[in-house]
């Protein structure tokens, strides 16, 4: 952040939300060095120095830059009277300047000298609390409130602490104010002179995080300003779909009219935000006219079962169709059948339990889990009815192995679908949330990196909030649509057993099919002269004499290819002691050169910044660099398939491991970035494959997954629910891979 040298930079008109759009900026950092501040702002400082007392200018400059030594020298020498440390024209005190520049040490010192924390000055007649809140400086706000600052005081625009917190768009400050100020000193629906509540301002700014949090504290969606606008009306003006969705879900009336007789549909038409409004309506169960979409199933379980079993039927019909009629007609029929099934599911089935009108919604349903299980079903059916009767005598062990593999595979699949990936429960006790916030403030870690803004708990290292599970997942790896669940600490090992078992079953099935086709060739070789070009005689016999089984084999082998890539990636990342999510984030972070994005809403003062914050395991989420191919999420059909099969991760591993992504840079390590949880391959594998219960037999530690939140990390037992610091690394050089 640039140092603030003039109140003009924070002046906000008091007319309409349009005039106040400048105040809805993202939180900004104020951790530049003094030298940077001096070079950037020297002309303004000199102009100010010419206009007022040089000693006062020096004092204010020291407050702005956090030069505590100079501030102490001036105060203790009696050069400045703290009861009058401002210019009579500007009326901006040293505490104002220290507050708006996030200089906590100066703020502490000035308050220790009994300055007036509620002194109102500047063009807006605002207090230091207002100045700090406008820029989202939660540490300054906390300290000022603890030392007597009054949150109910309003500035010349009629804004109090809550309004200015919303204007800052810093969700961390909003959460702090809601927990520590609202109800006791402020009403959540308090209004400014134009009748606008905090929720109305957040909706206009398109700040979905603040809107969601305000609604959790029961902010009114029915409140109207002097123009008759509700939060939904102003949200429609902005056109942020998530904001509209949150408001509609909480009972906002989209038919309600403003004072000039316009409802949300008319406003959306005028502001060209109809697409956002219609999308939000569909996600909340309404059509584009605002009427409820009919639901044809009473229980979501029933609709999920329909979605799950639909691919079973489709795959069987598809194989039978291609095995029975001409390929051209089969292709046309299959496309029509697929489109019809997709339309039916999205219109009549999925709306009963999933969000609508989003490209990713279909992937967050049991459909792909049904595709996998349906594939296993038809492979098993083919084996049981066609392959086994003709190969049991020749290959009894192989048939028994396939049967055992399918049973184990089905058991692991059911276990994974029903498993707990390691969910950290949401904290509902507000007193405990307050304790957590204060604890993080004291150590300089109250930001979205260390505090979950959705579940209100301190975020352990290696955890991530899952939109699917709506909870924090410990040692989060990825969401797997093929098992309809997240993969985390408590089911990651089971998942690896699952894909290893699946790959083994595919190879065994291939061997049995080739033996079966050989039997068919021997049976019919005297009656037919087969010629299939590049295919061998066995495959040719299978294609001609049992096309259905041939197609099942082809589909199964295709699955085996991408599962093989997935297995390689998982085993590689396990040996490196990193999860899929961590590896992807680290790779993207290396390619991201935009350091201006503050995705974690960090406003930690310099005095509280910890060196551990340089830990690359929890990096700042990359910004949007359209020229960086690794930063782009493909929205094409091919791109989605590429992601679903895990081939994108395989390519990323190859690039980062062998330097394909960055050939121009000299590299001494096997990876182009440091992994904080890589303790050497032996230790990493032990941490992953063995539970932390050293009293249990080794076989049990290997086969069982963690039953609680405790697991090994660097050979030590750690509680992943409370993992806030990584164990120190100590591994041998020969262990590095």
Curated annotation (Swiss-Prot):
The keyword Cytoplasm does not apply. Coiled coil: none annotated. SMART domains: ANK. It catalyses: L-cysteinyl-[protein] + hexadecanoyl-CoA = S-hexadecanoyl-L-cysteinyl-[protein] + CoA. One of its GO terms (molecular function) is protein-cysteine S-palmitoyltransferase activity. It is found in: Early endosome membrane; Golgi apparatus membrane. Belongs to the DHHC palmitoyltransferase family. AKR/ZDHHC17 subfamily. This is Palmitoyltransferase AKR1.
């Amino acid at each position: 952040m640039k140092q603030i040298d003039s109140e003009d930079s924070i002046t906000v008109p008091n007319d309409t939300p349009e005039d106040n759009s400048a105040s809805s900026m993202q939180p900004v950092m104020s951790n530049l060095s003094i030298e940077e501040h001096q070079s950037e702002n020297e002309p303004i400082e000199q102009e100010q120095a010419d206009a007022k007392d040089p000693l006062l200018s020096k004092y204010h400059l020291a407050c702005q830059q956090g030069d505590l030594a100079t501030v102490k020298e001036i105060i203790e020498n009696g050069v400045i009277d703290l009861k009058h440390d401002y210019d009579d024209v500007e009326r901006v005190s040293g505490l104002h300047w220290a507050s708006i520049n996030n200089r906590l040490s100066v703020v502490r010192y000035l308050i220790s000298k009994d300055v007036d924390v509620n002194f109102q000055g500047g063009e807006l007649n605002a207090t230091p609390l207002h100045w700090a809140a406008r820029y989202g400086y939660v540490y300054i706000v906390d300290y000022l409130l603890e030392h007597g600052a009054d949150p109910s005081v309003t500035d010349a625009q009629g804004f109090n602490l809550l309004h200015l917190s919303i204007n800052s768009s810093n969700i961390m400050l909003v959460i702090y104010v809601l927990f520590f100020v609202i109800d006791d000193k402020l009403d959540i629906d308090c209004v400014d002179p134009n009748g606008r509540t905090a929720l109305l301002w957040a909706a206009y700014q398109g700040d979905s995080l603040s809107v969601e949090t305000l609604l959790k504290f029961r902010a009114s969606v029915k409140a109207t300003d002097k123009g008759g606008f509700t939060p939904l009306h102003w949200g429609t003006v902005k056109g942020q779909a998530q904001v509209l969705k949150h408001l509609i879900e909480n009972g906002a009336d989209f038919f309600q009219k403003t004072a000039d007789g316009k409802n949300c549909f008319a406003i959306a038409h005028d502001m060209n935000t109809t697409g956002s409004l219609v999308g939000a309506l569909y996600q909340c169960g309404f059509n584009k006219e605002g009427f409820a979409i009919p639901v044809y199933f009473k229980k979501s379980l029933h609709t999920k079962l329909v979605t799950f079993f639909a691919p079973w039927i489709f795959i069987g019909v598809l194989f039978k169709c291609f095995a029975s009629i001409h390929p051209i007609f089969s292709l046309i029929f299959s496309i029509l059948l697929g489109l019809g099934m997709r339309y039916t599911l999205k219109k009549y089935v999925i709306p009963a339990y999933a969000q609508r009108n989003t490209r990713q919604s279909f992937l967050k349903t049991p459909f792909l889990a049904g595709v996998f299980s349906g594939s296993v079903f038809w492979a098993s059916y083919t084996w049981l009815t066609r392959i086994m009767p003709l190969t049991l005598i020749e290959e009894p062990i192989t048939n028994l192995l396939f049967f055992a593999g399918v049973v184990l595979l089905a058991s692991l699949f059911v276990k994974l679908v029903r498993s707990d990936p390691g969910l950290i429960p949401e904290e509902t006790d507000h007193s405990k949330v307050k304790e957590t916030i204060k604890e993080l403030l004291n150590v300089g870690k109250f930001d979205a990196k260390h505090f979950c803004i959705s579940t209100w708990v301190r975020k352990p290292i290696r955890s991530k909030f899952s939109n699917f599970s709506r909870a924090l997942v410990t040692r989060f790896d990825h969401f797997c649509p093929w098992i309809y669940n997240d993969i985390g600490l408590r089911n990651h090992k089971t998942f690896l057993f699952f894909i290893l078992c699946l790959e083994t079953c595919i190879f065994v099935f291939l061997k049995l099919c080739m033996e079966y086709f050989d039997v068919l060739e021997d049976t019919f070789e005297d009656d037919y002269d087969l010629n299939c070009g590049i295919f061998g005689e066995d495959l040719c016999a299978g294609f001609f004499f049992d096309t259905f089984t041939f197609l099942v084999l082809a589909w199964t082998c295709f699955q085996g290819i991408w599962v093989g890539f997935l297995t390689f990636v998982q085993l590689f990342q396990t040996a490196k002691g990193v999860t899929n999510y961590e590896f992807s984030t680290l790779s993207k972070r290396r390619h991201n050169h935009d350091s201006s994005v503050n995705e974690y809403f960090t406003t930690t003062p310099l005095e509280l910044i910890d060196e551990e914050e340089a830990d690359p395991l929890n990096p700042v989420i990359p910004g949007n660099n359209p020229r960086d191919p690794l930063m782009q999420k493909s929205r094409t059909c091919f791109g989605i398939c590429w992601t679903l099969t895990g081939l994108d991760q395989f390519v990323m591993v190859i690039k980062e491991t062998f330097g394909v992504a960055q050939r121009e840079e000299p590299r001494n390590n096997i990876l182009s970035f440091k992994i904080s949880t890589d303790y050497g391959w032996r230790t990493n594998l032990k941490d992953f494959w063995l539970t932390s219960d050293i009293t249990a037999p080794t076989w049990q530690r290997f086969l069982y997954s963690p039953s609680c939140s405790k697991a090994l990390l660097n050979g030590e037992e750690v509680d992943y629910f409370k993992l806030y610091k990584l164990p120190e690394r100590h591994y041998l050089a020969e262990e590095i891979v």
